[in-house]
Amino acid sequence: LYETGVRKQAGRVDNGDTLLDHDEMERSRGITIFSKQAELATPRTDITLLDTPGHVDFTAEMERTLQVLDYAILVISASDRIQAHTKTVWRLLNEYRIPVFLFVTKMDQPDNLQSEILTELQDFSDKIVAFSCYEQGTVHTSGDFYESIAMASEDETILNTYMEQGALSDTCIQTMIKQRQIIPCYFGSALKGIGVDALLNGLDAYTTDAYQTLTEAPFGARVYKITRDEKGNRLAHIKVMQGTLSVRDTIGEEKVTQIRIYNGEHYQTVPTVTAGHICSITGMETAQAGDGIGDYSDNPMACIEPVISYTITFDEAVSTRLMYTKIKDLDEELPELHLSWNEPTETIQIMLMGPVQIEILTQLIKNRCGVVPTFDSGK
């Protein structure tokens, strides 16, 4: 965001001044909890960035955004290398068939050698190719760039093209990335801004717009997230997969009353959006995360689901049944919770991923309802 001029200075999550981690819980903890949208532009490409949580307890929040991605940027710490959660994210990207760009950060720290890290990454996937080289605080393109791409593709036609021409066209590389024949990997330091320009140049050169031919089709979209704004308005966050959507259009029996394009916590309203755009709409009171709306019915099942069930209780002076009606909206925003009422025991049941999610949910309920819930040990 800083490199493309969206921000005048780079934010740091531990300083609480990032554009996207604007929720108070995110700023106080220094982690991303909720996925956020930002708009930026490179010389050739307008990009919508969806920033997602990296903590394992919020994997379901991350997975919801995978349903609407054209490309993913997977950030890996050079110090931590490939962790168990990295493998989970990788599996999800494979499940959703999403083309991936890798960015290995913290290369400026001692003992982080690109050759060692690249070898470990290529043991993980032989499709990974270094698209930049990090040496003593600078980034450049390697001399065997095209050869590495051709070898990783394992495609005889591409190998022959390289042998004959000594290079590969941007269009050829675009196709290989889109078809997941290769996975470009960039190296640098996000904190110091090293290598970020190389990644942006790669996104500019090697991504394609698949929606230009779909704007005239009947409107169809995917709902990937439900939230409520500070005034309680219900927002359906959607990716327009085809066609055009305008304010006052009817979807089923509901009318779109507003279309918002968010940039961090701020937004602008627009009259119309077309295929390929991500936006938030008001007026949709029944659509749920994962739904296809309009002329789009593809409805993927979530791969990540919590497996631990918890019982929520409150102070004796608080009606648990009443609290259930107040917090039921959370189930729309976080469907992985599977919030339910147990009539025989008159308790609230919920599914959660881990202790950090419990802490966040406790704070959410306190903020919205003014009471503090108690969770049992789970089963």
How should these model regions be labeled?
Residues 1-379:
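Structural and coupling elements of P-loop NTPases
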